[in-house]
Amino acid sequence: MPQNENTENKNQQKIVQTAGRAALGDFAPDFAHFNDDILFGENWNNQDIDLKTRCIITVVSLMSQGITDSSLKYQLENAKKNGVSKNEIAAIVTHVAFYAGWPKAWAVFNLAKQ
């Protein structure tokens, strides 16, 4: 998972990812490169969207797809670390439930409460 390091640019944390290479470097080096260098190295470090907003978007995207595994749990924890409050998570999940589905919201709430 991404590790945060401070940078001087706009005081936003720099995301550094090595999990792709660690898990798949020998088996799928192109995928590992895209995961570590493009998704996290470039996309997550693009400062046009702040990390808090980016975390919210990611949680909503996973929720809307019905992905409730460890990746959603990690992204909920990441959202909390980047300033998304418990009340904001509850309001976001409630709002998205009307568009993505009630059962998906229940699954997210079960993870978010942990």
Each PLM stretch: what is its role?
Residues 1-53, 73, 81, 105-114:
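Acidic, glycine/proline-rich low-complexity segments that act as flexible tails and inter-domain linkers
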Residues 38, 63-67, 82:
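Short alpha-helical scaffold segments that flank and stabilize functional sites
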Residues 54-62, 92-93:
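Short, structured motif recognition centered on aromatic/hydrophobic residues
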Residues 64-73, 102, 106:
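Short helix-capping/linker segments at secondary-structure and domain boundaries
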Residues 70-87:
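Mid-chain, well-packed structural core segment of small domains
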Residues 84-114:
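C-terminal binding/interaction regions
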